[in-house]
């Protein structure tokens, strides 16, 4: 048994070296051999066995065989969940990897389950970066929204905001980005009063930064214009669309996708007000900028 444990250690070192030098097929073969040895040398709840399942799963994922990778990563995670006391860092790492994998495979419910496990474990670890938790909460919210569960999505946005504010304070640029996501969610839900309030806060944060992030400010002004546009306050919407366009034109000579969104929204507003010629002129101008 001792000899097999030593051989397992040697093989793991070898596969790490092979992986580091981009010799993926050889690394996978070494990982498969190491796993067979681990099954003989270690108990079914030993962390070394979990390591072997995990490493082979990672290599298969790197190869692009995500379906096969998932099976090995699930076996590793099952072992990690049985360890007492639990290793929260290992559970976080494993659940996070499975969440992103399931998400990429379109397995939404499993992805939500593993995102939630990773978030719960990550909350117990002091040095987990706030943006990692925020990204996972945002991903859960997107899955829930796509499946029509808007009410369930809102707490994810609110929790992400709480995490960012706790780590960074209320006036940080990253807090403004989270506020923007929340406000867009409220706009889509036609909760315009809440959306307006939060967009105004995000805009204020961005405008007070030095140097001011012009693209972010342009985005905030466009999003706020959408709120006013949606509830029929066309004068405010037009003013903000114009301001957003002006800022986008300062960002780059050629327009970005966001610039074209503002053009489209503003042109729709002008057309709805009977200003068809002005809307056409705006679209022609945008096409000229797009063509350089």
Task: Please report, for each region that a protein language model flagged, where it lies by residue.
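TPR-adjacent "capping" and linker segments in tetratricopeptide-repeat scaffold/adaptor proteins
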Residues: 1-10
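TPR/TPR-like (Sel1-like) alpha-helical repeat modules
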Residues: 241-246, 264-291
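Short coil/turn linkers that connect adjacent helices within long alpha-helical scaffolds
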Residues: 1-2, 40-44, 82-86, 124-128, ...
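Conserved alpha-helical positions within TPR/SEL1-like repeat arrays
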Residues: 9-20, 47-62, 89-104, 131-146, ...
């Amino acid at each position: 048994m001792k000899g097999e444990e030593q051989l397992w250690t040697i093989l793991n070192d070898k596969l790490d070296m092979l992986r580091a030098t981009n010799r993926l097929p050889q690394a996978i073969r070494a990982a498969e051999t190491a796993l067979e040895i681990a099954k003989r040398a270690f108990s079914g709840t030993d962390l070394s066995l979990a390591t072997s399942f995990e490493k082979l799963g990672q290599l298969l994922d790197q190869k692009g065989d995500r379906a096969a990778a998932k099976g090995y990563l699930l076996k590793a995670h099952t072992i990690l969940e049985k360890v007492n006391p639990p290793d929260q860092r290992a559970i976080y790492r494993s659940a996070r990897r499975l969440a992103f994998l399931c998400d990429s495979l379109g397995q939404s419910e499993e992805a939500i389950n593993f995102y939630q496990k990773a978030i719960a474990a990550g909350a117990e670890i002091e040095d987990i970066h706030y943006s990692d938790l925020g990204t996972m909460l945002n991903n859960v919210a997107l899955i829930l929204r796509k499946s029509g569960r808007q009410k369930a999505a809102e707490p994810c946005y609110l929790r992400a905001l709480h995490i960012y504010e706790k780590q960074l304070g209320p006036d940080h640029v990253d807090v403004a980005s989270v506020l923007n996501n929340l406000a867009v969610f409220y706009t889509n839900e036609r909760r315009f009063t809440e959306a307006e309030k939060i967009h105004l806060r995000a805009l204020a944060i961005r405008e007070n930064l030095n140097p001011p992030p012009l693209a972010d400010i342009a985005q905030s002004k466009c999003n706020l214009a959408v709120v006013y546009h949606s509830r029929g306050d066309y004068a405010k919407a037009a003013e903000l669309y114009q301001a957003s366009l002006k800022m986008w034109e300062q960002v780059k000579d050629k327009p970005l996708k966001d610039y074209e969104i503002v053009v489209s929204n503003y042109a729709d507003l002008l057309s709805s007000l009977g200003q068809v010629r002005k809307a056409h002129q705006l679209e022609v101008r945008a096409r000229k900028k797009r063509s350089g």
